[in-house]
Curated annotation (Swiss-Prot):
Membership in a protein family: Belongs to the oligoribonuclease family.
Disulphide connectivity of cysteines: none
Protein name: Oligoribonuclease
Keyword Signal: no
Domain Exonuclease as annotated: residue spans: 20-183
Originating organism: Paracidovorax citrulli (strain AAC00-1)
C-alpha cells in the first residue's frame, strides 16, 4: 500500500449548466418515419467553445435491406466515407448507443439544461425523438443551430458566409467539429459590435 494520497485530477471540462452539447447524426435519408440512424457522435464544449471533449461515436447496425434501399446520394456519400461498411460490421443498437451517450453526457451537464447544438440540428432531433427518445429528452427544448447564422450571413454579410469553407466529410464526428468551428467563425466575423 502506498503512503501517498492519490492526486485528484480535475476533469478537462467541469460539469456546468453553461456547457454546450454538440451532436451530429448520419442517416439513411431525411424521413424519420422510414429512414434510420447510421452514426451518431457527441462533443461537449465549455461556453466559449473550448475545451472540446469528444464523447462516444457509434456506427449503428442496420439491415442490409435498409442500406440497399438508400438513395444514390446516401449510398455514394456513406460508401465513400466507409460508413456503410462500419454499419454492416457494427453490433451496436440504437438503444445501446443512446445509453452510452447518456452516461457520457451526465458527467458534463444536467438533464434538461443543455441545448442541442449543431448544423440543421432540428433534423437530428426529429430522428432522436423517434429512435433515441431518452437522449432527445435529456436536452433542453432549445437548439443552437449554426445553420441559422449561416443563412443570416448569406443574406446580410455574404463575405462572411463565403469565407467559411466546409470539408463536407459527412461523418458524424467530423461534422460536429466543423459545426463548432463554423460557430466560432460566425462569432468572430458576424456577431461583432
Amino acid at each position: 500500500m502506498s503512503d501517498t494520497a492519490p492526486v485528484s485530477v480535475p476533469p478537462v471540462l467541469p460539469k456546468s449548466d453553461l456547457n454546450f452539447v454538440w451532436l451530429d447524426c448520419e442517416m439513411t435519408g431525411l424521413d424519420p418515419e422510414k429512414d434510420r440512424l447510421l452514426e451518431i457522435a457527441v462533443v461537449v464544449t465549455g461556453p466559449e467553445l473550448e475545451p472540446r471533449v469528444e464523447g462516444p461515436v457509434f456506427a449503428i447496425h442496420q439491415s442490409d435491406a435498409l442500406l440497399d434501399g438508400m438513395d444514390a446520394w446516401n449510398k455514394g456519400t456513406h460508401g465513400r466515407s466507409g460508413l456503410i461498411e462500419k454499419v454492416r460490421a457494427s453490433t451496436v443498437t440504437e438503444a445501446e448507443a443512446e445509453q452510452a451517450i447518456l452516461e457520457f453526457l451526465a458527467r458534463y451537464v444536467r438533464k434538461g439544461v443543455a441545448p442541442m447544438c449543431g448544423n440543421s440540428i432540428g433534423q437530428d432531433r426529429r430522428f432522436l425523438v423517434r429512435y433515441m427518445p431518452k437522449l432527445e429528452a435529456f436536452f433542453h427544448y432549445r437548439n443552437v443551430d449554426v445553420s441559422t447564422l449561416k443563412e443570416l450571413s448569406r443574406r446580410w454579410k455574404p463575405e462572411v458566409y463565403a469565407s467559411f469553407k466546409k470539408a463536407q466529410k459527412h461523418t458524424a464526428l467530423a461534422d460536429v467539429h466543423e459545426s463548432i468551428e463554423e460557430l466560432a467563425h460566425y462569432r468572430k466575423h458576424l456577431l461583432v459590435p
